[in-house]
């Protein structure tokens, strides 16, 4: 790569004005940012110039710091450039402005804070009070909603009245963030703070009034109380800093000078900011009267599920009330020429974007192919072949990534590679194998495996009780368990499979009144259908169909990630290779779990340099692939309803999904394999439209 190419030089030589730098992946963004600081430093040679470079991850911060420290070309600006994450900048402000601040970082502290510290506040708000007193575990959801409102730009000091609340809601809808509000309102309904809205959708203002009176007024008081008591969440690192910085800017009698002043603020990955991030950046820029440079790529805006929006980088003048000069880095130094071409061909199907003419620096081309497989077993064989090429005994291993759209897609590959002793890295922050409910699913399979064995009555009773506990959505309470256990001990035989009638004959309360034993019969039927299954795959399918306690449940997902997307389909399809060998299936799952007990740090801010990360095989979702690169990328299940996800309905959602696919396959340096499937489980699958858009089908 040359020192600076033409597009990089144009950016670096620009006058000291507000700039939007569009920086596609692999175009030398880090180098360009630091050379820009050098150029501005030279322009202001008569006085010291200070730069604030804000990143959103520790990894990005460390990359910039390393380049600044190690490259002698940047020696002249080392003492003038501050590089930090937005959260770290905010926490430094908290420490300077409060005494003995307490940061809420674990579950117990958060629970205590809501349940006890905020008790005088929620006691005055009936809807919140009733929800907490009915189920104290709701504290987690309540604190998360409080943080989400801050992230969405609600302000307890300026947005107080119902009119101000409604106006901000409309602003968020205009920013295409209305869906995020709907998620929050649905959560408030599920935890019992709000009642359900009319099915016909009429009277939206009436519903917003209930949100305001039922929860938002509590949020105003609770947020104020926590700040006054120096108690902060991670989101408060930015929220407190924003309010404090804005107030200092408004109270200032004269501009900042000297070492206290930033002359230039540079914001990296600007396409991934949310309303709170924007507010804090604006407050810093306005107080310091600094220029601002917004660096990012609207085509890589893939974190909208966090409440971010690409609108900010598409229309910066609208939010900063200033003119911006736009520069675009035009040379991709990372990717082979044909990957750059296909990426451009794909992303140009999006309408809401800034068009870019990105050219490849490399003349070499990657191997690109589409592989259609019959089912998951054929897909595993394909992956094994690719992996074998990267772990040859006579050479150094190279890195390959298997990238899925959903976490559940990765589970069969985790089990398969672990059972084959293939070292891999599954750096997922939501490890479903480590959930308590997944352990219970395995326990049910163990019960199935021993169902025909003769055992002591109390052991049979315990197994039946475990099965009954997961038939319905909510588990049995202690009183129901005691009565049912007593009944089983008097009624069961030596084998579980011979004792199902003991469930049907029970007449006590069971997940409700159990009138005429109807509920008992339902329980018995569900258990019988499960125990009658022959193969491992059939047993898993029976659990998914008849055991509501294992079904998807977004309310329960707050406590256990298993419920967000139960992996029954993937497990059942994978389990077909085991036939009726339950023990081998369970052994392989346990091997995979043991492997995953040593997963690397999973925070987005974690460095990418530890020993586990250096393993040759990486399994990840597309959202975790951003910023990484591999010799080979295998994109899993390139079919409709996966790429794009089936929830996508609107133009904006389809464009967001296209950006995710764009990010996924552009991680490759030498080879991309798009794996399509004829079937996903029992469903016939059609190839993803994106393969047609880039001309591969």
Indicate residue ranges for each PLM-predicted region.
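Accessory N-terminal region flanking or inserted into the helicase ATPase core
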Residues: 1-23, 27, 31-32, 50-52, ...
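P-loop NTPase Walker
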Residues: 1-102, 288, 341-344, 666
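Helicase P-loop NTPase motor core
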Residues: 26-33, 37, 41, 322-325, ...
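Conserved helicase motor core of SF1/SF2 NTP-dependent helicases
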Residues: 27, 264, 271-348, 356-360, ...
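Conserved helicase core region in the C-terminal RecA-like lobe
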Residues: 83-92, 265-272, 295, 406, ...
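ATPase/helicase motor core of nucleic-acid motors
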Residues: 319, 365, 394-537
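Accessory C-terminal helicase-associated subdomains
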Residues: 455, 460, 487-490, 497-624, ...
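Helicase C-terminal subdomain and adjacent C-terminal extension
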Residues: 677-697
